[in-house]
Amino acid sequence: MKNNNPGIARTAKGHLLVDEHDVRKVVEYARSKAVELAVVGPEGPLEAGLSDGLIKAGIPTASPTQSAARIETSKSFMRNLLHRHKVKGTIRYKIVDNSRDLEAALDDLGMSVVVKPTGLTGGKGVKVVGEHLMTKQDVLAYGEEVFSKRIGGSAQIVLEEKLVGEELTIQAFCDGSTVVPMPAVQDHKRAYEGDKGPNTGGMGSYSQKDGLLPFLTRPEYDAAVKIMGDVIAALKKENAEYRGTMYGQFMLTKDGPRVIEFNARFGDPEAMNVLSLLKSDFSKICERMADRKISQKDAVFLEKASVCKYVVPEGYGTKSLAGEEIKVDEKAIAREGALLYYASVNENDGRVYTTTSRSVGVVGISDHVDAAERTVERALRHISGKIHVRHDIAKKDMLDAKVARMNRIREGPQ
């Protein structure tokens, strides 16, 4: 790991502080420790080919190869894959690599669109017309910035039709053929309350005890899972077998779930929701993914609701205050019945300091979302510093508004 994360350092028998994109050093360390099973967490190392390096070294790995991980690392590859295989849930899109083609694509799709650099941007490169970009000139200016600066590592943009509905996440364990879905989760990308402000990697998330969401029906959940299975099958047909955790982000529309994106890994923060509820042995699940032997009975979850809220540095989403000490009373948080997960922080001489990314995730578990949310809020009182939290996540008023909005969409013009 790059940062000295106190949670990981405390849990692991050994760890190496290294750039996680350095495939050679990570593989050498894994071999020196006789590692018997590997899981690659972040998307950057997947793009760098870390899974491939581990597999080549003879280490079973429950994460996709560089080729299969393109469903996340290349938005153009993902969209074209869905189009080639006629996967349900695909949307209208255009792929462009210069300003003239971008303007032509805008003329074709109209201004109700989303602008995405094709490569990895940590969830912060997506711009929605009407929210982040107000005019055609704004879109062209942002496009020129992407092309000239190679934002996301490539001078290419995917222009997508803007979807109307509620976003949701379904994650699944995959072994190349079988898809074992987890409870649905809803993340909140915007930095500020009321879903305002810049996009972030995710400020918090929640799940219900029935594995659904307040606005999501069982048939709609099943339809989204079917899409994920079709994507796994499509990758296999193109000799890019997918073994590992898959993250599907969907927009629930009046016509059912539509694909926003796929991640070749767990979602962050959504992993904290589902793994906090997992009753089964996670290491056994990973073994079975790596060995192509996963089945539905391998993953059993508590029938509980969960809420996660992220503590982030002041300025996160625009210009984070890095290097600031935050005080975390772990014992008091445990007494409140909450779980604590350190994220992108550095520990030095027993003190915890912020980086430019998210700092600490706090999770509450209960029979109902509102009770889990209250647990998190009590625990948050025991974390202090120059920090920011979205306190509105999973509040009853917010959830009621989402249900009402989805009902209006379903009942609207067909």
What are these regions (language model features)?
Residues 55, 62-125:
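A conserved helix-loop-beta module that forms one wall/lid of the active-site cleft
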Residues 14-26, 92-98, 129, 134:
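Short acidic-hydrophobic, aromatic-tinged amphipathic segments that line or gate anion-handling sites
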Residues 223-247, 263-337, 347-348:
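Active-site "cap" helix and flanking loop/linker of ATP-utilizing ligase/carboxylase catalytic domains
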Residues 346-349, 353-414:
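Generic C-terminus detector
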Residues 127-269:
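Internal nucleotide-binding/catalytic subdomain
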Residues 143, 322-326, 373-380:
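Short amphipathic alpha-helices in soluble, non-transmembrane regions
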Residues 1-66:
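ATP-binding N-terminal substructure of ATP-dependent carboxylate-amine bond-forming enzymes
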